[in-house]
Curated annotation (Swiss-Prot):
Name of the protein in question: tRNA-specific 2-thiouridylase MnmA
Catalytically driven reaction(s): S-sulfanyl-L-cysteinyl-[protein] + uridine(34) in tRNA + AH2 + ATP = 2-thiouridine(34) in tRNA + L-cysteinyl-[protein] + A + AMP + diphosphate + H(+)
GO molecular-function terms, A-Z: ATP binding; tRNA binding; tRNA-uridine 2-sulfurtransferase activity
Gene: mnmA
Function description: Catalyzes the 2-thiolation of uridine at the wobble position (U34) of tRNA, leading to the formation of s(2)U34.
Organism whose genome encodes this protein: Bordetella avium (strain 197N)
Places the protein is found: Cytoplasm
GO cellular component terms, A-Z: cytoplasm
Keywords, ordered alphabetically: ATP-binding, Cytoplasm, Disulfide bond, Nucleotide-binding, RNA-binding, Transferase, tRNA processing, tRNA-binding
Ligand binding (ATP): G14, M15, S16, G17, G18, V19, D20, S21, M40, G129
Active site, per annotation: C105, C205
Region described as Interaction with tRNA: spans on this chain: 155-157, 321-322
Claim: Iron-sulfur is one of the keywords in the record: no
Amino acid sequence: MVQTLQKKGRVVVGMSGGVDSSVTAWLLKQQGYEVVGLFMKNWEDDDDSEYCSTRQDLLDAASVADLIGVEFEYVNFASEYKDRVFADFLREYSAGRTPNPDVLCNAEIKFKAFLDHAMSLGAEHIATGHYARVRAVDTARGQRFQLLKALDASKDQSYFLHRLNQAQLSRTLFPLGELHKTEVRRIAHEIGLHNAAKKDSTGICFIGERPFREFLNRYLPTAPGPILTPEGRRLGQHHGLAFYTLGQRKGLGIGGVKGQQREDGTADAWYSARKDLKNNALYVVQGHDHPWLLSDTLRAQDVNWVDGEAPAAGAYAAKTRYRQADAPCELRADEAGFDLSFAQAQWAVTPGQSAVLYDGDVCLGGGIII
């Protein structure tokens, strides 16, 4: 195993009520740790909404803790989430970008507010159900902690964890990093967890699965505007620029509009390609591989390097969205951010999303695409 768990002390496990964090708590108890399960409530604006699953998730987490015999506690981080994550989320959408709140939520809530709270409970480590790994290495600068991809490539979550620092990683355990999801479900069934078949959570971090347009409208003023082609032809009206992202095909409302057609009468689909905030216009292009959707370079800022120092210039690999295959690239970093040049043009590189850099299985860090 990459991550050797030697010192058996107190570890606080973030328990969400899902199968991953439940199995994490059980595994650590089996390894001899004093486990405390902690449920984090991070959203309370609409607790009575049909989309809010917090109550059931809390009951699921408490039930698992009781079954496996670990202490269980509850903490409310709703204020911290709103100030540190949600406010940034709204600012980014207002600026025409498409943020990834899961990245900031991990850095500010799960591995900062949660870590601080766990330390106040006398914990030596925290643990979560993320699919990633931590490795301690000896260097000329002393012991350093590397963030590695999970063994299960289909579930690897290192992309969302790239903003973690050395202090956070030194206190963090990821027991599921060495397992495949099928093994986790099997363990859950074998030990009799009632949530063994519970589906994985999706949607905005901690806010859940709810109609995005309806949700965003509650917090962000939006105005309709024209949908235009690169030539300036008006095709329709958008509902507000915040509701669209680069490369979006569904939900444009122009499905019946014909553009350039082939000899057989068929035509390529329309894709969202650019936002003009000044004129409140959404530009769309026809065809998945339209030049407006392809980029062979990018610039990122608001950077975090896991090691604390920028990597040397050279050849690496990068992801510009979750579940994307690693793309070979050249890195040039400076004090304000970094530039990437890709061997092959990347599709729909989206401002506000994270560009995350890798050296093999090692996640080096990343920044926000501008």
